[in-house]
């Protein structure tokens, strides 16, 4: 103990100024655990600038950063889930829906928008994984069919960003029926000669991967995305064999021909726009910086609290 500490009590030795860091300014990469400035991460489309790990992205933000500004019209937002079976497990289905809606800010697990990407008309939809694991229920199926119908009506392509754990067990057979319903809708789109591009993000599993996600004219995976039907442990217990490392990652699927390409999220707008233009006989879109988000806004660093 120093001579000063002997004279003064520690309780009386305080800092003249107490600084505080506002919430939401910093975050940590879920892969490399690097501490990141959140505004920089947002500008980088939530891809870690240190290790290129693709973090999970909110459905609405994904569509807003993918589609051109001023061209977006949401479809099917009036559709809301209903508890027709009065389902109850450890909680009532109604309670789970209310909690998911509050946590995610969405009415259900799929967001659909009509717009354009680099000037190429498209209908785009994205799964919201934070809404009950992106599970597919009646509203998800209905909104996806609405997206297909809009693509047919406007004679344009359809793209879907999948992020789902599969069918929603609380809706039982009505949920499983959405696998057939969405697949039949995509058949109608194909009959019209219109393209469907499926982008599988982390994770795309269960009934979604077994239906609409794998039915693209072109199937794209984001880097290191988990894509499959059943989980690794379930499969190993069934076949009683040890499976290869990373066998459900997009790189493994590309190597074995299950998907067509892997595209970095920052390159997605340019790549998809070029594919859609070629598949619909339109002029190739202008090449732009892949880091330009269409709704980029300046970010001011909040001042630290000066009260001490």
Curated annotation (Swiss-Prot):
Q: Main localisation, per the record?
A: cytoplasm
This enzyme catalyses: N(6)-carboxybiotinyl-L-lysyl-[protein] + acetyl-CoA = N(6)-biotinyl-L-lysyl-[protein] + malonyl-CoA
Q: Which domain of life is it from?
A: Bacteria
Specify the residue ranges making up the C4-type zinc fingers.
29-51
Question: What is its subcellular localisation?
Answer: Cytoplasm
- Which positions are annotated as binding Zn(2+)? 29, 32, 48, 51
Checking Gene3D superfamilies in the record gives: 2-enoyl-CoA Hydratase, Chain A, domain 1
InterPro entries, per the entry: AcCoA_carboxyl_beta (IPR034733), Acetyl_CoA_COase_Trfase_b_su (IPR000438), ClpP/crotonase-like_dom_sf (IPR029045), COA_CT_N (IPR011762), Znf-ACC (IPR041010)
Entry keyword annotation includes Zinc: yes
Give a yes or no for keyword Calcium in this entry: no
One GO cellular-component annotation of the UniProt record comes to: acetate CoA-transferase complex
- Enumerate the SUPFAM superfamilies for this protein: ClpP/crotonase (SSF52096)
Pfam families in the cross-refs: Carboxyl_trans (PF01039), Zn_ribbon_ACC (PF17848)
Q: In which pathway does it act?
A: Lipid metabolism; malonyl-CoA biosynthesis; malonyl-CoA from acetyl-CoA: step 1/1
Q: Ranges for the CoA carboxyltransferase N-terminal domain? A: 25-294
What keywords tag this UniProt record?
A: ATP-binding, Cytoplasm, Fatty acid biosynthesis, Fatty acid metabolism, Lipid biosynthesis, Lipid metabolism, Metal-binding, Nucleotide-binding, Transferase, Zinc, Zinc-finger
Q: Which cofactor does it need?
A: Zn(2+)
Q: How does it assemble?
A: Acetyl-CoA carboxylase is a heterohexamer composed of biotin carboxyl carrier protein (AccB), biotin carboxylase (AccC) and two subunits each of ACCase subunit alpha (AccA) and ACCase subunit beta (AccD).
The record ties this protein, via NCBIfam families, to: accD
Role summary: Component of the acetyl coenzyme A carboxylase (ACC) complex. Biotin carboxylase (BC) catalyzes the carboxylation of biotin on its carrier protein (BCCP) and then the CO(2) group is transferred by the transcarboxylase to acetyl-CoA to form malonyl-CoA.
What name is this protein filed under? Acetyl-coenzyme A carboxylase carboxyl transferase subunit beta
Organism, by scientific name, is Vibrio cholerae serotype O1 (strain ATCC 39315 / El Tor Inaba N16961)
